[in-house]
From Swiss-Prot:
NDH shuttles electrons from NAD(P)H:plastoquinone, via FMN and iron-sulfur (Fe-S) centers, to quinones in the photosynthetic chain and possibly in a chloroplast respiratory chain. The immediate electron acceptor for the enzyme in this species is believed to be plastoquinone. Couples the redox reaction to proton translocation, and thus conserves the redox energy in a proton gradient. This is NAD(P)H-quinone oxidoreductase subunit 1, chloroplastic. NCBIfam families: PRK06076.1-2 (NF004741). HAMAP family: NDH1_NuoH. It comes from the Eukaryota. The chain crosses the membrane at residues 26-46, 98-118, 127-147, 246-266, 268-288, 300-320, 336-356. It is a multi-pass membrane protein. The keyword Transmembrane helix applies. It catalyses: a plastoquinone + NADH + (n+1) H(+)(in) = a plastoquinol + NAD(+) + n H(+)(out); a plastoquinone + NADPH + (n+1) H(+)(in) = a plastoquinol + NADP(+) + n H(+)(out). Its EC number is 7.1.1.-. Belongs to the complex I subunit 1 family. Pfam families: NADHdh.
Length: 363
């Protein structure tokens, strides 16, 4: 069979067109991911600056002021310093576990951002099991901490890793029961559907008023999951030097530093999504999603308004964990476990049973 040059050119141009389509498809997949990573990076830098400024205000002292205007570049300066420090390995530790541990902690938290809606249709993965995927992914992080503690071949590091694992297990269950109660109220486990279910009545439609007990339990459990005071037992300086971070230096120590603030930001974002109405305004019967369909300008400003509302609620909520750091003393290990197993677990289970009963009676 003879094929002339015209047909060959047509076939070649077709394959070139198909390859270009594949390249464009890959680019359109990567753009949202890179945008999200850039936004998360900026968000973490803002949290570090806010914590230092709020902490300085609480302690009546001057915060960072030399690295950039108002000290906003202080976190960037700290990260650059850690980046150029020597990366040491323990002589008798397990080098593979020691190196993998920080990466597991950071990656597991980063994956949680994929199901967070920052606005109407502004979510990387709108899944029907969104909130439970977050819980499943976040439960991987303590494994990385335990690997870091064991791989360091240091008694303080190992005890810190064990404390982190025990603390995570103790508070993961009440947290899951609170999320399950929200899913029952919203008739969905999708983060987008949960926000939409709170939108009709504005401020009074928030799950904060429908689930006040669940909100308090979720707040306490999320503080414990983030290892913030008064739940920072895995890193207690007076007892364990620096816990599972004791043997780390350089960029690996910086990864733990970043993971702590990433976890704090993702917890605050989920509080906004689950209890504070997400991207919706506080005015009843006015929805940000309707702004998309008004005109072309609305299609541009609608997502911006949604992102602004979500981040405003998130950063306002962040004042609570920052303030508790300088307000409450650290718990003992037995007090921490008793609080999780003897108080929060029964109360969250009772809250779930009440929510289930009310939903059944409303049918």
């Amino acid at each position: 069979m003879i094929i002339d040059t015209t047909e060959l050119q047509a076939i070649n141009s077709f394959f070139k067109l198909e390859s270009l389509k594949e390249v464009y498809g890959i680019i359109w997949i990567l753009i949202p991911i890179f945008t999200l990573v850039l936004g998360i990076t900026i968000g973490v830098l803002v949290i570090v600056w806010l914590e230092r400024e709020i902490s300085a205000g609480i302690q009546q002292r001057i915060g960072p002021e030399y690295a950039g205007p108002l000290g906003i570049l202080q976190a960037l300066a700290d990260g650059t310093k850690l980046l150029f420090k020597e990366n040491l390995l323990p002589s008798r530790g397990d080098a593979r576990l020691f190196s993998i541990g920080p990466s597991i902690a950071v990656i597991s938290i980063l994956l949680s951002y994929s199901v967070i809606p920052f606005g109407y249709r502004l979510v990387l993965a709108d899944l029907t099991i969104g909130v439970f995927l977050w819980i499943a992914i976040s439960s991987i992080a303590p494994i990385g901490l335990l690997m870091s503690g064991y791989g360091s071949n240091n008694k303080y590091s190992f005890l810190g890793g064990l404390r982190a694992a025990a603390q995570s297990i103790s508070y993961e269950i009440p947290l899951t029961l609170c999320v399950l109660s929200i899913s029952l109220l919203s008739n969905s486990s999708s983060t987008v559907d949960i926000v939409e279910a709170q939108s009709k009545y504005g401020f009074w439609g928030w799950n904060l008023w429908r689930q006040p007990i669940g909100f308090i339990i979720f707040l306490i459990s999320s503080l414990a999951e983030c290892e913030r005071l008064p739940f920072d037992l895995p890193e207690a300086e007076e007892e364990l030097v620096a816990g599972y971070q004791t043997e780390y230096s350089g960029i690996k120590f910086g990864l733990f530093y970043v993971a702590s603030y990433l976890n704090l930001l993702v917890s605050s974002l989920f509080v906004t999504v689950l209890y504070l109405g997400g991207w919706n305004l506080s005015i009843p019967y006015i929805f940000v999603s309707e702004i998309f369909d008004i005109n072309k300008a609305g299609k541009v400003f609608g997502p911006v308004i949604g992102i602004f509302i979500t981040l405003a609620k998130t950063y306002l909520f962040l004042f609570i964990p920052i303030a508790t750091r300088w307000t409450l003393p650290r718990l003992r290990m037995d007090q921490l476990l008793n609080l999780g197993w003897k108080f929060l677990l029964p109360i969250s289970l009772g809250n779930l049973l009440l929510t289930t009963s009310s939903q059944l009676l409303s049918l």
